[in-house]
């Protein structure tokens, strides 16, 4: 049975996005990590923010330190949580506004 509305595990609709679950990030992972840390802000711990995003504290720490490449699923969750564009999260360009 084919579902016409594909969704990620956390129920965010893909809306026609045809990209592998892991994207090729050409930007500096440390810079991406700094932007993820900026989105988390000072009011949430890594454990709390990880629960919101559906990842563990250790994995979130790896993303923030630039030791792990963020998945498309994580980028979509960051966008949904923060309203920041995926372009800004990945490249730092295009402003942090909504897409």
What role is predicted for each listed range?
Residues 73-88:
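DNA major-groove recognition helix of helix-turn-helix/homeodomain DNA-binding modules
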Residues 3, 7-42, 52:
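A short, Lys/Arg-rich alpha-helix, primarily the initiator
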Residues 34, 58-61, 73:
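Positions in alpha-helical segments
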Residues 41-65, 81:
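Short alpha-helical DNA-recognition segment
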Residues 88-99:
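Short amphipathic recognition helices of helix-turn-helix/homeodomain-type DNA-binding modules
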Residues 39, 72-73:
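Short, Lys/Arg-enriched C-terminal cap helix and immediately downstream tail that follows
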Residues 63, 76, 91-92:
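Residue-level "edge-of-site" marker
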């Amino acid at each position: 049975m084919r579902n016409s509305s594909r969704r990620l595990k956390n129920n965010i609709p893909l809306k026609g996005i045809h990209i592998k679950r892991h994207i090729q990030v050409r930007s500096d992972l440390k810079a991406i990590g700094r932007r993820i840390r900026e989105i988390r802000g000072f009011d949430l711990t890594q454990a709390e923010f990880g629960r919101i995003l559906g990842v563990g504290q250790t994995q979130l720490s790896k993303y923030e330190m630039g030791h792990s490449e963020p998945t498309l699923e994580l980028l979509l969750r960051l966008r949904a949580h923060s309203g920041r564009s995926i372009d800004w999260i990945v490249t730092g360009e295009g402003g942090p506004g909504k897409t």
